[in-house]
Design a protein with these regions (language model features):
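Post-transcriptional modification and biogenesis factors for structured RNAs
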Residues: 1-129
């Protein structure tokens, strides 16, 4: 499953009452790290052998066709602007979440949930669960 969440310092206040309610208290059960320079931190993850996948409208492959069984980081942008060009450029792969009809993008929570479900499913199969 997920072992932690990394956010930019420019993100919303994680301990704002609305945020805490939205997480249903999970914010207290999941380690998180706020980073000042996300691109530098992403480079450190890559140096440590962690594969990085960015949810991106320019992704040419489906998120479903990727292997998430090894050390993995999923990059999700904000709802207004998506990922910065700098972060998207540092990801190992840009992937898409296929959508039907006129839907162009999903909010960050939904995109994150879709990825986490896929990662969990792949790892459960690998472990024979």
């Amino acid at each position: 499953g997920v072992t932690g969440v990394i956010v930019s310092r420019k993100t919303a206040d994680l301990f704002q009452p609305k945020t805490i309610r939205a997480t249903m208290g999970s914010i207290y059960r999941m380690p998180f790290l706020e980073v000042e320079r996300p691109a530098e931190f992403l480079s450190r993850l890559t140096e440590r052998g962690i594969r990085t996948f960015a949810a991106h409208l320019k992704g040419t492959e489906s998120y479903r066709t990727q292997d998430y069984t090894g050390p993995t980081a999923i990059l999700i942008g904000n709802e207004g602007n998506g990922l910065s060009g700098e972060l998207a450029g540092k990801a190992d792969k840009l992937v898409r979440i296929p959508m039907e009809g006129r839907v162009e993008s999903l909010n960050a929570a939904i995109a994150s949930a879709i990825f986490m479900y896929e990662v969990h499913g792949q790892r459960a199969i690998e472990q024979g669960v």
